[in-house]
Amino acid sequence: MKTEAEKGGSAILEKVFVIVEKLQGRIQEKASGICISTAGMVNTEQGAIFYSAPLIPNYTGMQFKKLLEDKFKIPCEVENDVNCAGLAEYRSGAAKGSHVALILTIGTGIGGSIIMDGEVYHGFSNSACEVGYMHMNDSDFQTLGAASILTKKVSEWKGETEKKWERMT
């Protein structure tokens, strides 16, 4: 199921509702919880997006934890997608066996994660390693280096349409 992020936070939430309902219909026992891995800066205690790039309209302020717990009556946890990728690398991937892992992802945005002794390091105000949002030369880092922006720049330099380069991202 495509996210269709351009439709905004409410549309994404509706898709999450549909996915959870479908999954609940397929399993014999009631699920014991829901975990959401999402783009944006996440307040993990509240389970809410406190900042998101403009790629997803009306995403900042989404209260995933509250809305999902209210609807499905089971616990919900929400974490940044790059932090989840960092945990996966730490537990099963290239960082397995290390005490500290620094993870960098490059996709539609640029994200970072620090895992120390098996735990996500969230830092001050849940913003540790949010490298994509670092301010650089009147812009943020992900605007300067994200795959989508690099694709646009390459297509401009080559005088070609972005469509030709989209499959590369």
Model segments located where?
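Amphipathic alpha-helical linker/stalk segments
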Residues: K2, Q24-G25
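Glycine/GP-enriched mid-protein hinge/lid loop-to-helix segment characteristic of carbohydrate kinases
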Residues: E4, G8-G9, E69-K71, E77-E79, ...
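Glycine-rich phosphate-binding loop and adjoining helix at the ATP-binding site
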Residues: A5-F17, E21, E29-I34, M41-V100
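Surface-exposed helix-capping loop/turn segments at secondary-structure junctions
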Residues: G25-K30, E162
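Short glycine-rich anion-binding loops that position phosphate/pyrophosphate groups of nucleotides
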Residues: A39-V42, G107-G109
